[in-house]
Curated annotation (Swiss-Prot):
GO terms for cellular component: cytosol. It comes from the Bacteria. Belongs to the NusB family. NCBIfam families: nusB. SUPFAM superfamilies: NusB-like. Gene3D superfamilies: NusB-like. Keywords: RNA-binding, Transcription, Transcription antitermination, Transcription regulation. This is Transcription antitermination protein NusB. One of its GO terms (molecular function) is RNA binding. Involved in transcription antitermination. Required for transcription of ribosomal RNA (rRNA) genes. Binds specifically to the boxA antiterminator sequence of the ribosomal RNA (rrn) operons. InterPro entries: NusB-like_sf (IPR035926), NusB_fam (IPR011605), NusB_RsmB_TIM44 (IPR006027). It comes from Treponema pallidum (strain Nichols). GO terms for biological process: DNA-templated transcription termination; transcription antitermination. Signal peptide: none annotated.
C-alpha cells in the first residue's frame, strides 16, 4: 500500500506521523484532529503525498496498536514499556508498524529513519535504544 507514495518525501512524512503519534499519546488529541494536520506551521506546507503517507502511518499504527505495543514490550530488556519516554515510544510504535505491516519497505530503511528521528527529537541515548529494539523486532518479523 505504501508504494503509491513517492520515496523522496517519506522522511518528512515519517516525522509528521511521529509528531502526530506523540501528540496523541502526550496530549490526548483525537486522531481526527491530528490527521487534518491543521496544527502544522510549516512553510512550505507538506505535499499531498507527504500528508497521505503520514496519515497511512499514523492511522495504521493506531489500528494495530495493541499488537505493536505487545511486540515492542516483548523486545525490551530491563525496561518497562509504560515507563518509556513518550518520544521513544512514538518512534518505536511508528517504526514497529512499518516493520510488521509494510513489508515492501526494507527493514534497514525503517531502522535508519527511526534512528534519524531519534537523533533529532530524542535524548542523547534515544538513537541507540531505538536502534537496538527495532533491530530485535526486524530479526523476528
Amino acid at each position: 500500500m505504501s508504494e503509491v507514495f513517492p520515496k523522496i518525501g517519506r522522511r518528512r512524512a515519517r516525522i509528521l506521523a511521529f509528531q502526530a503519534l506523540f501528540a496523541w499519546d502526550a496530549a490526548g488529541i483525537t486522531p481526527e484532529t491530528l490527521t487534518q494536520f491543521t496544527w502544522l506551521r510549516r512553510n512550505p506546507p507538506p505535499s499531498t503525498q507527504d500528508l497521505g503517507f503520514s496519515r497511512l502511518l499514523f492511522l495504521g499504527t493506531l489500528e494495530h496498536l495493541r499488537e505493536i505495543d505487545g511486540c515492542v514490550s516483548s523486545r525490551l530488556e530491563h525496561w518497562d514499556f509504560v515507563r518509556l519516554n513518550k518520544v521513544d515510544k512514538a518512534i518505536l510504535r511508528l517504526s514497529a508498524y512499518s516493520l510488521l505491516f509494510q513489508k515492501d519497505i526494507p527493514p534497514v530503511v525503517v531502522i535508519h529513519e527511526a534512528v534519524s528521528i531519534a537523533r533529532d527529537f530524542g535524548t542523547d541515548d534515544s538513537f541507540r535504544f531505538v536502534n537496538g529494539v527495532l533491530d530485535n523486532i526486524a530479526k523476528s518479523a
